[in-house]
């Protein structure tokens, strides 16, 4: 998902760099993730990465926030069908970190997103679709190829 969301990103390089920084005992790495309409659809994988890093390194901290720009990138732009996918991903992610006190902030943000998905009215799905069409055309790739299902 990182590669789709931010063209040019090579996830293995990002992960390798995070590990190299965490291995330096005098550094306290802070992994700060921006959750978008795309990444929330694979939230469980991001949490798996957080857990993997926390299990290997005690000096690492995590933070996440949700994107609101560009217009159409917020998870609140998802339609009913994709909100169900996101809700399931968030629920799975919360279960994975339930017994991890160091991930309290992450759990709180996930719960906030879960509430938003169920309470915030659907709006701007067309903007997300248009942005996705633009990305797919510009990058010669497909949302469907990355996620395994159609967005619209």
Predicted regions and their residues:
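Radical SAM enzyme [4Fe-4S]-AdoMet core and its adjacent flexible, acidic
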Residues: 1-152
